[in-house]
Curated annotation (Swiss-Prot):
Sequence intervals crossing the membrane: 1-21
Database matches in Pfam families: p450
Family from the record: Belongs to the cytochrome P450 family.
Residue numbers binding heme: 446
Gene3D superfamilies: Cytochrome P450 (1.10.630.10)
Role description: Cytochrome P450 monooxygenase; part of the gene cluster that mediates the biosynthesis of betaestacins. The bifunctional terpene synthase btcA converts isopentenyl diphosphate (IPP) and dimethylallyl diphosphate (DMAPP) into the sesterterpene betaestacin I. The C-terminal prenyltransferase (PT) domain of btcA catalyzes formation of GFPP, whereas the N-terminal terpene cyclase (TC) domain catalyzes the cyclization of GFPP into betaestacin I. The cytochrome P450 monooxygenase btcB is then responsible for the six-step oxidation of betaestacin I to yield betaestacin II.
BP term (GO), one: terpenoid biosynthetic process
Organism classification: Eukaryota, Fungi, Dikarya, Ascomycota, Pezizomycotina
Keyword tags: Heme, Iron, Membrane, Metal-binding, Monooxygenase, Oxidoreductase, Transmembrane, Transmembrane helix
Protein name in UniProt: Cytochrome P450 monooxygenase btcC
Amino acid sequence: MSFPGVIFVVSFFPLLMGIAVYRLLWHPLASFKGPKLAAVTDWWFCKKWLNGRYHQTLEKLQLQYGDVIRIAPNELVFATPEAARDIYTRCNPDQDLQFIKQPPFYKQSEGFPTLVTETDPAAHRTLRKPLERGFSPSSLKDYGRVIERVADDLTAQLEKASEHSNAVDVKAWAARFTFDVITEVTFGKSSGTVAQGKNTVWLDLLTGNIAAAAVGVAIRRQPHAVKTLLRSIFAKLSKTAKLRAQYLSVCRKMCEERLRDPPKAANLFDHVLATCPPVEKDADNHGYLVFLQGQAAALVSGGTETSSTLLSSLIYNLLAHPAHLARLQYEVRNAFSQSGEIDIESTKQLKYLQAVIDESLRIFPPVGFGLPRVCPGAMIGGVYVPKGTVVQAPDILMVRNSRYFVRPYEFLPERWLPKDHEFYDEQFSGDRKEASKPFSLGPRQCIGMSLAYAEWRIVLAKLVLKFDWEIIGETQDLMDVARLKLLWEMPPILVSFKPVGGLAAASPGA
């Protein structure tokens, strides 16, 4: 090693040691428990984040350190419903204390902030308010017809597969279903992936780049020099930038087509137009289109991935628990005699179906990590947290916790039933249902929650009415086989759907 190199190492090592000692002993978070290496460097978090087992790591840390865990030099994880309420409901621009979204996590490299990535509470409210009208009860009634038609396309495709005794990958069809619904609801034009039985380029781009997005989160946590170096290396080894550009290009094309030929049917794009800030329009409307493509991309992504994850995991869990599937068959097949009776309003009466959905959201939350916020200096769950600390409260640490749910690791829809239901079970009366918050809380709560519930109720009711289901292969806890790469990566879920004879199901008993 050259003399300058020796000088650099000799000088740099004490600096690193000094930083480590400071973070362990004198940092404002030094009193909070957690892995020592996590307190010293973000690299500990990045390693756990990228190995696909982050959710299981958090569960182990909670058992070891309790309900408040230091997972990075300046970051805490909380594991109580009270902390979740404190973190996620205080982000209103009218409040003195605001927990804003952590910019490095949500930051995007191009375009305008979206409903998902906007960190400023006032700007977020400006974006969200016009869009809320697009998710009103009257709008959802219009979207219901879209959901019904796409669900009918899906049952037709599954019936074709059954004629050849072919099992299908539920994950693939769930993604097509939710993608077709959200693209038509957004643009007023069908993508047709279900009817055609194959993915579009847009859907492939959307679902094929999850792991790279997780890497992006890890890179953005690094110091500037390291971040620049890693981005340079990653850009050469990965197609991420190219895929992202292709994805936005498709979004832009859809926006251009929508502007040229507005549909008569109700659609979210009308409300997206109302959110557009004043932008300088050049010859080709570039700034205007960049804004629109970003908002559309956020809506389509948000309405596809997590919704399809829930649908896939729900079907998987029902097949792993035949007694609960039998109860759902009993409810649906005695409520409807034909598929045309199934719509948004009629499915609201299916209490067991709703319980199945809520239990699926609990035992396998579509978002498997905590949404990071920046603390303004406030009490969280009875603990004072210094200003500038990044905080989060992952659902995963509460929904599978025996303090909040009886038999937390078991799939038991009965816990969500009202007392007057024939399958109600008193053992679940002490469950703290508020500990499950799959759509988050407060002003940042998922804007598409009602649409998602409508999709799940309608498509599941049609699938249960039309088919008997049989899984191919063994089943196990999805948490053990899935990998968390920002979103969930699950192995193929192969299912055989066989048309039923048309008789109402007999009572499965108590």
